[in-house]
């Protein structure tokens, strides 16, 4: 179920949102960020397991995750689903459809979530007053493409244990950017969803979590994970730790 929430005059806007350092305003001068307040006029609340948008829906907006988290996924002709991304607060969902002018994936809430609706006509309108906005969205699209390419490289070139380690380190970095703990967080996605994303079976993911626990790399209790040995995880994927 979706529930649309019109913004009240005292609601948090882009210029006062605590996610501004990772969302649309990231890197923009303060005087320009104030003009972004005109971009978002409503929010949508999406219950866990419900869809924000479907594959091939016309693209009339992109969405900034305000709280909660979502997954994006594709479905092939046989009905098999492939998860293409997990999206945390401050991240923009739907950018991958801007070239085709339609959504190229479906977006589903992993938990009760709320997103800011950024309608494309509003982007065009505000861009006439703020020419740098179009460039900002190109940067955001570039960030999304880079993330997708990194994921393809991870799945294509790494062993199974390296894929899971890279996934956990990626979440660690993203939570740190939000100002949360980089070593303790809750996995909002199931192990089966992690496996689907990484190209691993559920059994392999479960086995690797157990192995990482035995080796002292992590401590996990159901979906609560603590990264105990960050240097060890980085070494596993061939990164030098500082």
From Swiss-Prot:
<comment type="function">
    <text>May regulate gene expression in response to changes in oxygen levels or to changes in the redox potential of the bacterial environment.</text>
</comment>
<dbReference type="GO" id="GO:0005829">
    <property type="term" value="C:cytosol"/>
</dbReference>
<keyword id="KW-0238">DNA-binding</keyword>
<dbReference type="InterPro" id="IPR018490">
    <property type="entry name" value="cNMP-bd_dom_sf"/>
</dbReference>
<dbReference type="Pfam" id="PF13545">
    <property type="entry name" value="HTH_Crp_2"/>
</dbReference>
<protein>
    <recommendedName>
        <fullName>Transcriptional regulatory protein btr</fullName>
    </recommendedName>
</protein>
<dbReference type="InterPro" id="IPR014710">
    <property type="entry name" value="RmlC-like_jellyroll"/>
</dbReference>
<dbReference type="InterPro" id="IPR000595">
    <property type="entry name" value="cNMP-bd_dom"/>
</dbReference>
<dbReference type="InterPro" id="IPR050397">
    <property type="entry name" value="Env_Response_Regulators"/>
</dbReference>
<dbReference type="InterPro" id="IPR012318">
    <property type="entry name" value="HTH_CRP"/>
</dbReference>
<dbReference type="InterPro" id="IPR018335">
    <property type="entry name" value="Tscrpt_reg_HTH_Crp-type_CS"/>
</dbReference>
<feature type="DNA-binding region" description="H-T-H motif">
    <location>
        <begin position="191"/>
        <end position="210"/>
    </location>
</feature>
<dbReference type="GO" id="GO:0003700">
    <property type="term" value="F:DNA-binding transcription factor activity"/>
</dbReference>
<dbReference type="InterPro" id="IPR036390">
    <property type="entry name" value="WH_DNA-bd_sf"/>
</dbReference>
<dbReference type="GO" id="GO:0003677">
    <property type="term" value="F:DNA binding"/>
</dbReference>
<dbReference type="Pfam" id="PF00027">
    <property type="entry name" value="cNMP_binding"/>
</dbReference>
<keyword id="KW-0804">Transcription</keyword>
<feature type="domain" description="HTH crp-type">
    <location>
        <begin position="158"/>
        <end position="231"/>
    </location>
</feature>
<dbReference type="InterPro" id="IPR036388">
    <property type="entry name" value="WH-like_DNA-bd_sf"/>
</dbReference>
<keyword id="KW-0805">Transcription regulation</keyword>
């Amino acid at each position: 179920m979706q529930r649309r929430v019109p913004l009240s005059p005292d609601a948090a806007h882009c210029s006062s949102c605590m996610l501004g350092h990772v969302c649309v305003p990231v890197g923009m001068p303060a005087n320009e960020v104030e003009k972004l307040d005109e971009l978002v006029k409503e929010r949508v609340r999406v219950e866990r397991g419900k869809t924000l948008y479907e594959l091939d829906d016309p693209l009339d907006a992109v969405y900034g995750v305000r709280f909660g988290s979502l997954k994006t996924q594709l479905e092939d002709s046989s009905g098999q689903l492939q998860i293409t991304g997990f999206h945390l607060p401050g991240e923009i969902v739907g950018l991958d459809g801007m070239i085709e002018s339609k959504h190229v994936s479906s977006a589903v809430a992993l938990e009760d979530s709320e997103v800011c609706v950024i309608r494309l006509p509003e982007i065009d309108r505000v861009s006439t007053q703020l020419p740098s906005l179009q460039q900002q969205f190109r940067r955001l699209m570039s960030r999304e493409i880079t993330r997708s390419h990194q994921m393809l490289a991870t799945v294509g070139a790494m062993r199974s244990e390296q894929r899971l380690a890279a996934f956990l380190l990626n979440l660690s970095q993203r939570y740190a950017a939000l100002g949360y703990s980089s070593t303790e967080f809750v996995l909002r996605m199931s192990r089966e969803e992690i496996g689907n994303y990484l190209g691993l079976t559920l059994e392999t993911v479960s086995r690797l979590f157990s192995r990482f626990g035995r080796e002292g790399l992590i401590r996990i209790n159901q979906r609560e994970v603590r990264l105990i040995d960050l240097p060890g995880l980085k070494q596993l994927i061939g990164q030098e730790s500082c």
